[in-house]
């Protein structure tokens, strides 16, 4: 049920004729606790709660389940067209489930681009109370998207903004922005396995998008 918290209270069906007895969705959820074959899952927008908040808000009372976009195996199993085209579709549009409901390239690309424009960027700014404008975050994501597979770090990215865009953004600020995207499961990062101790500090690493379709959408499917 989407936006369940907006549902108004209703008359208690177990007490007909008693107009003063009302129940809400909370009462319904509490009633499910006594059933042995029912699991209750609560989800929310990035702007409202991230995984880092779960440990605090639901300490010892819940378990986090990290749901990723579809893997290729899952995508292939659900792909409605000829299976020989599944890989090409997957590496182009990724594994966001709703992509599979779109028919044309235009519909799929618009959906993925709108996720950034209307949801992800706004959520990250709102959730983290960032001073950065959406354009700066857009540019950072574009740089990371075009450099997937290349070693980089916040210092190099900061220098890129300064030399190419003429924007002075401290490497600490770039690092903080990247961490926001990682917390929102938009990006991930991979360290070199052969680095030890203090060498980890500012050593180049690789950033990647959790969904290849989202990465391609950042570049308007040019690469």
Model-identified regions with their sequence ranges:
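Conserved Walker B catalytic segment
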Residues: 4-41
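Short catalytic/ligand-binding loop motif for oxyanion handling, primarily in non-cytosolic enzymes
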Residues: 7-9, 49-51, 99, 217-218
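Short, glycine/charged-enriched secondary-structure capping and boundary segments
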Residues: 13-16, 25-27, 55-60, 81, ...
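A generic local structural motif
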Residues: 26-30, 51-52, 194-195
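Interdomain motor-coupling "hinge/lid" segment immediately C-terminal to the ATP-binding subdomain
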Residues: 37, 45-47, 51-151, 155
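Accessory nucleic acid-recognition modules appended to NTPase machines
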Residues: 105-106, 110-223
